[in-house]
From Swiss-Prot:
Localization annotation: Cytoplasm
Record gene name: lysJ
Name of the protein: Putative [LysW]-aminoadipate semialdehyde/glutamate semialdehyde transaminase
HAMAP family: LysJ_aminotrans_3
Lineage, broadest ranks: Archaea, Thermoproteota, Thermoprotei, Desulfurococcales, Desulfurococcaceae
PANTHER family assigned to the protein according to its UniProt record, in alphabetical order: ACETYLORNITHINE AMINOTRANSFERASE, MITOCHONDRIAL, AMINOTRANSFERASE CLASS III
InterPro entries the record matches: Aminotrans_3 (IPR005814), Aminotrans_3_PPA_site (IPR049704), Class-III_PLP-dep_AT (IPR050103), LysJ (IPR037537), PyrdxlP-dep_Trfase (IPR015424), PyrdxlP-dep_Trfase_major (IPR015421), PyrdxlP-dep_Trfase_small (IPR015422)
Length: 388
């Protein structure tokens, strides 16, 4: 007798079967419509089934799906051209991969090879992935438990910039930082700390890595969130939305850094595959031609303003955090019941960040009506019958 294998879920099941999506909305198998502020952990920032991405992927699927990066393909060439138009000006080299954690692994490996050192510095409350090296620079002890992770020195995001120099050892190969901590309660790194980390990296000959997997590609209202810090890294990771929701990631570096991974020092079967590259090219073009970062900044300002007006003063709310369309509401209680209420009663999908923050990662296309739906739904779900 054939038995369907049991699917092991990495994340807690939300009790919802999603069958269709269109831009900022998804539908379940009963036809109910939801505003999606979860967006596949932020991957659907350009919208579910964005026609520009769908058209490019369907066209490519009819021509060529699989090819090793030992060969050149038109879709890879197009992806390089389009992504280069939105890349930060300091970047000179790029590799395409499949997932965010893969990008972090490659970034750290390149740093080790380029510097000849082994030490790593990261920030407390960071999240960079769940494979071995990326897990080693992820703070959450629950994720790390039982796994022989690499030694990492963790600094507080509130570290005094004047203290950074003596906290970064001489044997450091890489300092890795998220401009805004996706799982760390949406804590923003401040410019003074970023500058101190840049100076410390230069002093010891380490490479500074900015992890822009969640913050990048327009979500914060800039193409890359680190643009607001006045600091340039040596390496940057990108992922989630760079292929319009399909699996793709990238690592960018200064000249000579990623080159250490060439000629068999690194590899990935599906890296730079034609289908994903067609999606990266289409997504990059759409981001630029449609002015997506500017639209995200405007939509984020609207949503943040409504949250501050209606939500921030509630008795059970500590504050509103984030930037652009990467926003969070810090609560004085477990966000789990609030997330369930949003889904079941308000038809808004969201997720948590850290222990007490409701995280909102909607597509760039949300409207004022959508923003009001989120805010009034949050107000009802936070207050319940308490009259707060």
């Amino acid at each position: 007798m054939n038995v369907v294998l049991k699917f092991v879920r990495f994340y807690g099941y939300r009790g919802l079967r999603i069958v269709k999506g269109s831009m900022q909305y998804v539908w379940d198998d009963s036809g109910r419509k939801y505003l999606d502020c979860h967006a596949g952990h932020g991957a659907a920032f350009l919208g579910h089934s964005n026609p520009a991405i769908v058209e490019a992927v369907v066209r490519q699927a009819r021509e060529l799906v699989a090819a090793s990066s030992s060969f050149s393909t038109p879709s890879l060439e197009e992806a390089l051209t389009e992504f280069s138009r939105i890349a930060p000006p300091w970047a000179e080299e790029i590799v395409f991969l499949n997932t965010g954690t893969e990008a972090v692994e490659a970034a750290l490996k390149a740093a080790w090879l380029a510097t000849g050192k082994r030490g790593i510095v990261a920030l407390k409350n960071s999240f960079h992935g769940r494979t071995l090296a990326s897990l080693s620079v992820t703070w959450n002890p629950r994720y790390r438990r039982g796994v022989p992770v690499l030694d990492t020195r963790f600094l507080s995001p509130s570290t005094d910039p004047g203290e950074v120099e003596k906290l970064v050892p001489e044997d450091t190969a890489a300092i890795i930082v998220e401009p805004i901590q996706g799982e760390g309660g949406l804590t923003k790194i401040y410019a003074e700390l970023a500058k101190a980390l840049r100076e410390a990296a230069d002093r010891v000959g380490a490479l500074l890595i900015f992890d822009e997997i969640q913050t990048g590609f327009g979500r914060t209202g800039r193409v890359w969130a680190h643009e607001s810090l006045g600091v340039e890294p040596d390496i940057m990771t990108a992922g989630k939305s760079i292929a319009g929701g399909l699996p793709a990631s990238a690592v960018l570096s200064r000249e000579g850094v990623l080159a250490t991974l060439a000629s068999g020092r690194h590899g990935s079967t599906h890296a730079a595959n034609p289908l994903s590259m067609a999606a990266v090219a289409a997504a990059s073009r759409f981001l630029r031609e449609e002015g997506v970062p500017d639209k995200a900044r405007a939509a984020g300002a609207l949503l943040e303003g409504l949250l501050r007006d209606r939500i921030e003063g509630l008795r059970l709310v500590r504050g509103v955090r984030g930037e652009g369309l990467m926003l969070g509401v810090e609560l004085r209680l477990d966000p789990g019941p609030v997330l369930r209420c949003l889904q079941e009663s308000e038809r808004v999908l969201a997720l948590r960040s850290g222990a007490t923050v409701v995280r909102l990662l909607p597509p760039y296309s949300i409207s004022r009506e959508d923003a009001e739906m989120v805010v009034y739904g949050l107000e009802r779900c936070i207050c319940g019958g308490s009259g707060c």
